[in-house]
C-alpha cells in the first residue's frame, strides 16, 4: 500500500528573520510565521492525514496545530524531530555580513555540512 509523506518546515521566527541560529532554543513563530502556516494549511486543506508528527519545539508544534486545524487527526510529538543543537552558538548571527560565530570552521555547516566544526556543547551530524 502506497503512503504519502509530507515534510513541512515550521513557519518563520524572529530568529530566522535576523539570521540567528536557533537549533533547540524554543523560539515561537512570529506573525509572518503564523501567516505562512495558515497559507500552508489552506494549500493542504483537502489532503487527508492519518496523523501529524512534530518536534516538541513551540514553533513546530504551532505550525502543526495550524495545519491540522479542526481535523480529528492525532498530533504526535517526538523528540526525534528536534533540530540539531548548536550549543553555545545558539542565538548568534550566521549572516555573512554580520557573522558573530567565533570559529570559522562552523561555516561549513552551510556549505559542507558533513565536515563542519561542531560548536561547543552542540551536536554534529553523527550525533543525530
Language-model-derived ranges and their functions:
Residues 1-6:
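Extreme N-terminal starter segment of soluble prokaryotic enzymes
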Residues 12-71, 77, 126:
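Active-site-proximal alpha-helix that buttresses catalytic centers in soluble enzyme cores
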Residues 71-127:
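Phosphate-handling substructures
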Residues 7-11:
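Histidine-centered catalytic micro-motifs
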